[in-house]
């Protein structure tokens, strides 16, 4: 259970890379990856995300049996900004949860894949790990943080992997 999120994330990336009509690409050198993502991730010297001090007033930790590691935190940051998680490579989590707006969206309804609109305003995504709410989304349809992370990818309007209208389904 400890490595479940990492395994799901890797599996999801592998699955998404197989969902293409394009020719197979060759491996990209590490330097090219750094240039594409505009960051300098050094796997041997990761930031210390796992051991952050937490204020005493915070009593809840939504990570449960899936503790945060530096590797998982870096993977999460990369996936959060990765537009290839949408069916048409135009939308990432950060498209709606914009850092400049407190990880929320300045519009009433966010824009999803193929120019479509979502039905709701994107919720703010700050410290969901320590949220005192027991469920996620406006309608509380996600019982766990892991479900909250994967649901938008499978939504027809948000990121498109819904299984509707001939689209692939990740579920």
Regions found by a protein language model. Name each.
Residues 1-8:
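Bacterial N-terminal signal peptides that target proteins for export
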Residues 8-17:
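Bacterial N-terminal signal peptides
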Residues 19-171:
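Periplasmic c-type cytochrome electron-transfer domains
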């Amino acid at each position: 259970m400890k490595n479940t999120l990492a395994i799901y994330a890797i599996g999801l990336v592998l699955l998404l890379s197989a969902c293409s009509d394009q020719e197979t690409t060759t491996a990209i050198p590490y330097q090219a990856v750094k240039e594409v993502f505009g960051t300098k991730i050094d796997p041997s010297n990761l930031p210390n995300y796992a051991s952050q001090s937490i204020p005493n007033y915070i009593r809840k930790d939504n990570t449960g049996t899936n503790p945060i590691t530096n590797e998982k935190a870096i993977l999460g940051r990369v996936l959060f900004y990765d537009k290839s998680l949408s069916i048409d490579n135009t939308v990432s989590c950060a498209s709606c949860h914009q850092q400049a707006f407190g990880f929320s969206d300045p519009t009433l309804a966010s824009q999803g894949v193929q120019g479509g609109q979502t039905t709701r305003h994107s919720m703010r995504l700050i410290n969901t790990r320590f949220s005192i709410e027991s469920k996620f989304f406006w309608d509380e349809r996600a019982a766990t943080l892991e479900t909250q992370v994967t649901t938008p990818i499978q939504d027809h309007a948000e990121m498109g992997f819904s299984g509707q209208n001939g689209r692939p389904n990740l579920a």
